């Protein structure tokens, strides 16, 4: 089974999530929650992570983490492994605690509102789960970073960074007035919950430019053993680029493909290049180049590989 590729680079921001094995609790009591936070603090000390938001639920957690050193993978391996060992030791258990590999969505953190969307989602998670009654303030749920945003600096852990989120809310200073304004805006956001624009789906949250930059990194890093939506999208983007490059060189537009024979030598040559340089299926290649049935394309490519491309067919 293909492993999911983890794209790491200095300054990357991720929304990290993981659930208990078989959706069972990963915290038996508040002592376990404190144990997890202590382990997270150690992980941040080792990795220099900066955490923008976190929330501990019964059988899963959310973490919005920035990695100045581009080291999400070793940090998460340490965090999950050490917490599992400590949990098992405390409860005299053994075996897996978490369900498979954690999910990590890339988040564009350059001030376009994406970091705010993710952190708001994390801080409002207890509301969606029914853990905060309608008459209670949001900070009454103590197992998230939100109450710490409303505290002064001495009460916060060093690894919690609040300035970025406050800035995206348009709050320039981490002051009593700024924190009061933040609380008011979050309560208003809570009342509007249900119309939010962010859901933790896919593999990244950001602008199209940000997505394309990530896909370029994936294209450079990916190996045949890698899997995941970002790898599939990177492969698709590469194949589309090659196909368009070939059409431009021939002076063809996409409709020209439909008007040419399915076995046109140039189509076969382009198909061979796509087959050689990408991981796209014969189905995709046949559809993109208007070459008909997959079996027909496979036969054409076999003949092409046996005789080799002629000088008239070779453009590059």
Which residue ranges define each predicted feature?
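N-terminal functional module of multi-domain proteins
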Residues: 62-64
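Short Pro-Cys-Gly-centered "Cys-loop" motif that presents a nucleophilic cysteine in a tight turn
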Residues: 1-57, 66-316
């Amino acid at each position: 089974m293909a492993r999911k590729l983890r794209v790491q680079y200095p300054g990357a921001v991720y929304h990290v999530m993981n659930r208990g094995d078989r959706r069972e609790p990963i915290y038996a009591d508040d002592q376990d929650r404190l144990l997890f936070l202590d382990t997270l603090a150690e992980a941040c000390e080792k990795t220099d992570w900066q955490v923008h938001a976190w929330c501990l639920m019964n059988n899963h957690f959310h973490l919005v983490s920035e990695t100045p050193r581009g080291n999400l993978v070793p940090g998460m391996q340490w965090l999950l492994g050490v917490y599992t060992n400590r949990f098992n030791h405390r409860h005299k258990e053994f075996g897996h605690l978490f369900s498979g590999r954690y999910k990590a969505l890339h988040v564009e953190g350059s001030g376009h509102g994406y970091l705010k969307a993710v952190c708001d989602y994390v801080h409002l998670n207890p509301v969606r789960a029914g853990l905060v009654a309608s008459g209670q303030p949001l900070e009454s749920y103590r197992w998230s970073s939100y109450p710490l945003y409303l505290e002064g600096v001495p009460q916060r852990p060093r690894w919690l960074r609040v300035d970025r989120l406050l800035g995206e809310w348009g709050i320039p200073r981490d002051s009593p007035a700024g924190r009061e304004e933040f609380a008011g805006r979050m309560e208003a956001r809570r009342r509007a919950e249900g119309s939010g624009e962010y859901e933790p789906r896919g593999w990244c949250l950001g602008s199209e430019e940000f997505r394309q930059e990530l896909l370029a990194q994936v294209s450079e890093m990916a190996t045949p053993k890698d899997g995941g939506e970002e790898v599939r999208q990177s492969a698709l983007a590469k194949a589309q680029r090659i196909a368009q490059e070939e059409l431009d060189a021939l002076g063809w537009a996409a409709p020209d493909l439909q008007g040419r024979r399915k076995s046109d030598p140039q189509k076969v040559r382009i198909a061979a290049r796509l087959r050689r340089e990408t991981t796209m299926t014969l189905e995709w290649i046949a559809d993109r180049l208007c070459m008909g049935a997959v079996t027909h394309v496979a036969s054409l490519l076999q003949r092409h590989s046996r005789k080799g491309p002629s000088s008239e067919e070779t453009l590059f």
